[in-house]
Amino acid sequence: MAGASVKVAVRVRPFNSREMSRDSKCIIQMSGSTTTIVNPKQPKETPKSFSFDYSYWSHTSPEDINYASQKQVYRDIGEEMLQHAFEGYNVCIFAYGQTGAGKSYTMMGKQEKDQQGIIPQLCEDLFSRINDTTNDNMSYSVEVSYMEIYCERVRDLLNPKNKGNLRVREHPLLGPYVEDLSKLAVTSYNDIQDLMDSGNKARTVAATNMNETSSRSHAVFNIIFTQKRHDAETNITTEKVSKISLVDLAGSERADSTGAKGTRLKEGANINKSLTTLGKVISALAEMDSGPNKNKKKKKTDFIPYRDSVLTWLLRENLGGNSRTAMVAALSPADINYDETLSTLRYADRAKQIRCNAIINEDPNNKLIRELKDEVTRLRDLLYAQGLGDITDTNTVPGGPKLTNALVGMSPSSSLSALSSRAASVSSLHERILFAPGSEEAIERLKETEKIIAELNETWEEKLRRTEAIRMEREALLAEMGVAMREDGGTLGVFSPKKTPHLVNLNEDPLMSECLLYYIKDGVTRVGREDAERRQDIVLSGHFIKEEHCIFRSDSRGGGEAVVTLEPCEGADTYVNGKKVTEPSILRSGNRIIMGKSHVFRFNHPEQARQERERTPCAETPAEPVDWAFAQRELLEKQGIDMKQEMEQRLQELEDQYRREREEATYLLEQQRLDYESKLEALQKQMDSRYYPEVNEEEEEPEDEVQWTERECELALWAFRKWKWYQFTSLRDLLWGNAIFLKEANAISVELKKKVQFQFVLLTDTLYSPLPPDLLPPEAAKDRETRPFPRTIVAVEVQDQKNGATHYWTLEKLRQRLDLMREMYDRAAEVPSSVVEDCDNVVTGGDPFYDRFPWFRLVGRAFVYLSNLLYPVPLVHRVAIVSEKGEVKGFLRVAVQAISADEEAPDYGSGVRQSGTAKISFDDQHFEKFQSESCPVVGMSRSGTSQEELRIVEGQGQGADAGPSADEVNNNTCSAVPPEGLLDSPEKAALDGPLDTALDHLRLGSTFTFRVTVLQASSISAEYADIFCQFNFIHRHDEAFSTEPLKNTGRGPPLGFYHVQNIAVEVTKSFIEYIKSQPIVFEVFGHYQQHPFPPLCKDVLSPLRPSRRHFPRVMPLSKPVPATKLSTMTRPSPGPCHCKYDLLVYFEICELEANGDYIPAVVDHRGGMPCMGTFLLHQGIQRRITVTLLHETGSHIRWKEVRELVVGRIRNTPETDEALIDPNILSLNILSSGYVHPAQDDRQFLDSDIPRTFYQFEAAWDSSMHNSLLLNRVTPYREKIYMTLSAYIEMENCTQPAVITKDFCMVFYSRDAKLPASRSIRNLFGSGSLRATEGNRVTGVYELSLCHVADAGSPGMQRRRRRVLDTSVAYVRGEENLAGWRPRSDSLILDHQWELEKLSLLQEVEKTRHYLLLREKLETTQRPVPEVLSPASSEDSESRSSSGASSPLSAEGQPSPLEVPNERQRELAVKCLRLLMHTFNREYTHSHVCISASESKLSEMSVTLMRDPSMSPLGAATLTPSSTCPSLIEGRYGATDVRTPQPCSRPASPEPELLPELDSKKTPSPVRATETEKEPQRLLVPDIQEIRVSPIVSKKGYLHFLEPHTAGWAKRFVVVRRPYAYMYNSDKDTVERFVLNLSTAQVEYSEDQQAMLKTPNTFAVCTEHRGILLQANSDKDMHDWLYAFNPLLAGTIRSKLSRRRSAQMRV
């Protein structure tokens, strides 16, 4: 087998007359084998180049040295293909191109000797080589077939018997073939030439009759070339059979360029169907043979559409099969044909990738005959099996092939008796065939196979006789049609009679012109149709040809000159020289005659022409050849039709029509828009009138101007400054808007194999991560001094995986580089892959993917504070080396001490680097400047411009407590109140004092010298080599002191720098302020010698560790499923939050049982996470979905009705693509909804006199209505089905329904399956205290926010309401290569906030460690310790922080305005105090107005304890696990409370009892009616968000809760997952019974009250509504619970205890 690619050649022709008339320009250029095409519409665009095996330049004249003649084309292609044919291979040559591109000229050529095409030259060369053979043992035979494919129909051009369309069939052995296609034997080139001429005549006749041209039909010329070699020694004859297929394809054209309409358009569609299928086949074969897919196993998707057209079906072996194939693409050079020429080049470019596996066809007959006989035997056996064996027996000719003539109604015998005797058998045979399944097909196959056998067994002499018989029939048929014959009876070819007048045909195709010649005999020559009553001498057919069309009358006049007169018949359209003839007209030689619409002839009279030449030797000759086009133009001109004018008029009419229709459409669209706007405005007014009551503006009184106090002005200024620099929304908009550029850059990087990854990153200007100047926007320099918070920018992190470097680009730089990347990508398609790979190995400065990278990389930064120089005492610091991401990379030991000017450095041994004394200046002007600024800059970076090098930031006097929090640094959150004393801190206040008395060694104007010694560096990873350190002051980043590099192996002792640097400073106020609060910056660098970057999906596999406030999602939170019944309304923008509630929601899926009840389906809780579970459902059972809402009763939350419950987004993965439109959304039928009472079993978890609200609704769910296979089938093993449910619930006083959304996880089992999980769940509740169905629910914790409607006129609100399109979901070319990578979005902001918090905490830790080290040093050196550093001061500070809400007094002993407690705070303080003191009055009841219900509950708890103070919490019988649950959530807010409570815990509610629908005027809670009436009803915007459970468990175990109204304690299992504590009945309970929101609760602890009440290990939790008393098992356990509930309080308690123990030990 020989595998070779298809040979592809392109050839460009000269301009034709049409192109020259339009002054076309040449757009094709050729150089060697490369062909280039230029886009005339965009000349600046880079020309497209294509490489082929041959590029033939035939655009110029033959005198051009680069001109490719017909001979050259044949030598390159034809000779090679002919040689392959002699070798025994199948050969195919086909030409492709648009109409008029020169295909037929290349394949057929002209009759002139030097103008012959590939086909005649190949045939002539074939017989020349045969005749030149001198080997007597070789014999050759040649057979020819010629067929035409027109409109998917096949016609035989050589056999006149085959008038109809031939069938294309497929044989299992022979493959596709044309049934009954004649194969004629030829013995010389003249025979082939005659057959080609005869075929063209037949093609011309048929085309003329059907008004066709060759450009609309495909011609296939097949040569069967057989070589026989006789071996004299073995007396064996071997054969080689080659099939030479020469194909002239139809023109590829576009309808808009040819103006085709009607039948021509249908014909063009059929042609384009064939050519389109050919293009699909070429593309599919090219893809299969391309590099990436070549070695892969063939897939079912690798389908080659051969059968889509007859052409590709017949050429199947030639395209990618057993053939040597060559393609010649004919090109038009004109710019007006750019699109068609480019399409042809692309076809050819794809075709050169096809590989054909050709084999030498040796001895095909013997093998084929054997296989065919085997098939005949098999088919005969099949007929015997069907009981039809006598068919073959009775229709067998002895000694010959078996023919089934009886099946077609023919008898091999000519006798009538034989025919009559077989009539009965034939009829019975037909009946048997009719009722025998499959027998007709078998007989048809048998017939087909026997016909092939007969053809193969035909001898060469028989083939010659059959060829001659067909030739005689063909010529007889042509003679009947009036076509001129030779004397021997053959048809005339290229021949011109010398005397007789005659007609020659003219055709649009030059190959068909002058192909047919009709004699005009003396007398009358009639022209008409074949079906005329009188025999016609010239037979024509087709449209507009009458039965008797016209008469040619030839009469001889004097002198022997014959005169021919044309007499048209009545009603016949006949034109002479363009004029319609209605009466006899004398013809002159050269006249053009048109009969009907498609038959065009030229009249030739040789004698008459000779006489005219003799009379007028200089007779004028026409300026252009008299051809078909000339006759057509003449006809139009004589008929008064100006084509150019007609086209211009038609074009003008079309433009006018287009203009009218466009104006009409614009008018209708405007009318429709106005109509819709009016309807929307009316609907909006209707909604406004419904939700917004009309307010009488006349009743509004003008408000008096409010007089603000100084403190209120400060608060307003602080709030204004806070929101002015707020960045969360703007950062999100930048991430969303630029995501598409990031995706495109990554896609191009992957396709070009650049090994560079791009990802968004947030950078904040902090001490640990200063921003370089090139990343700051231009406007940043102006507001840098006035910004109260460090700037956060969105940048692009560029990870160069090839060089192991990381760069940061601005978004503008990314867009600029992206333009260069696109240009590189476009150029890469034209550059060979080998060149691209070579370029990848060299990183040049011109590559937009790479930047220059330094040898050393920053390991991290460390900060050393200098406040020990105030006293002065020496300190040795061990500071952490922190990277810009907040990771500790190692530690650095640095010594700082004050020295005298002449003091020498200590001896550290060899290798010490001793430097001289450096002088640093501090300017007081900057200090005064910053003192006058009201808003200091926090955390200034060192990366200012040259004018800011002397910037002094230490004058701010900012200490440990003065810096903003991480939230303020990132501007993502806003604290409730501004930090007081922003410029002051306790440490700085203690260090402030008279500079001239307290700091004697730091007198202003004196010179102070101190020493900084870099000792060692440790714990630095071995991936960093050549470590060195440099340090500088924050304001003098240009003056850095550097150590020498040291080799780092990661093992052994720490790296010893021992670098000593003495620094002399002139003491100024700014210097003193600097050493009080500001550090020295140490930067550690190293050479990075590893490439740490993982693959492109790094962000997906290893996300940053989240903040403790933003936990990673266990399961993605889905957006609500769109409602199907509710009309889309404009969502009002929420304003200030009015109140919040915590909702505990139970979800159940109930299935119909045999007894008719709906029982909750089993839920598998083995996942371990709260609020999660998998529903185990049965297939094909009716179901209902039950949802129960539980919350504390409040006056602002009233449920009216469930508007709609929708389910959708059926999937088998937790994630869902919410951008896609889900067609399977189903709106459920609500069966019931309303408020319910909990069942008695649920009351055991509640306090009966606590107002609680249960709202439940139920809907029928038919899962089959989704039409989803995932819900209808049994779920496969290890697969889960996910579904999203959304409930739209209408609330009173709300503008729109609230939406609760939950993702369900389900597994479907067979209908009768016994679920394995149910057994484990029964074991789970095996104690008997819980019912089996109580665990069959999934819970969800939600936060309901009721907000006021925002003011639409607020500019800030309008900015926050702007909608920015998230471009990360937009498709980018090559996105599928990114393997799931996505640009970072909103989560990046939250992760960056956690990074900033880490950096802030690390900075505070270093500052605190410094102060502790300084205090310890001062104590050991017997120096006076400042008040801020003393233990007593620390204890007071901690007590102040632990009290939380305590109010320190001002200097005058009066509380500041902000510190005055309001009424609510006072009530809360009284409640907590009474809880701890346990001195409540026993008779205290609800009748007291000034005390809330929560105080009453706490009083009852206290009274219970006072009744039995001696009760042991762990030994009493009442402490055993009971069915009663303590009141974890008690009470309601009082009348004076204007804030809405935040419920924190929820009970369970199985099997509730429905209550009657509540009236809208009533409330489900016992709220005073007078209070409700007094409160004005304001419209609110509801928003419900699901709370995702944290995966981090801070503490879990048992706690004892004091039960109300009793002296007993109830034992409950508690799991703390901050910020919530989840309550369970036991450690085996899987359903959350209630939750406690720790973020809104306050934890109280008092040892004195424990001792007085004799209730050890207890602490209280106070919420907005009640207090809860809890007891732990031991003292250690209690402190652990305190740490889990409130880490700060636990730390304070432990600090006090440790100080107390140390004091006791000292005593």
Curated annotation (Swiss-Prot):
CDD domains for the chain: FHA_KIF1A, KISc_KIF1A_KIF1B, PH_KIFIA_KIFIB
GO molecular function: ATP binding; ATP hydrolysis activity; identical protein binding; microtubule binding; plus-end-directed microtubule motor activity
Pfam families in UniProt: DUF3694, FHA, KIF1B, Kinesin, Kinesin_assoc, PH
Ligand binding (ATP): G102, K103, S104, Y105, S215
Location of the Kinesin motor domain: 5-354
Gene Ontology BP, a term: regulation of dendritic spine morphogenesis
Membrane topology qualifier: Peripheral membrane protein
Known EC number: 5.6.1.3
Major location (coarse): cytoplasm
Biased composition (Low complexity): 1429-1453
Free-text note regarding domains: Composed of an N-terminal active core containing the motor domain (MD) and a neck coil (NC), a central regulatory center required for dimerization and activation and containing the FHA domain and coiled coils (CC1 and CC2), and a cargo-recognition region containing a coiled coil (CC3), an undefined region (UDR) and the C-terminal PH domain.
The protein's name in its UniProt record: Kinesin-like protein KIF1A
Annotated organism of origin: Rattus norvegicus (Rat)
Gene from which the chain derives: Kif1a
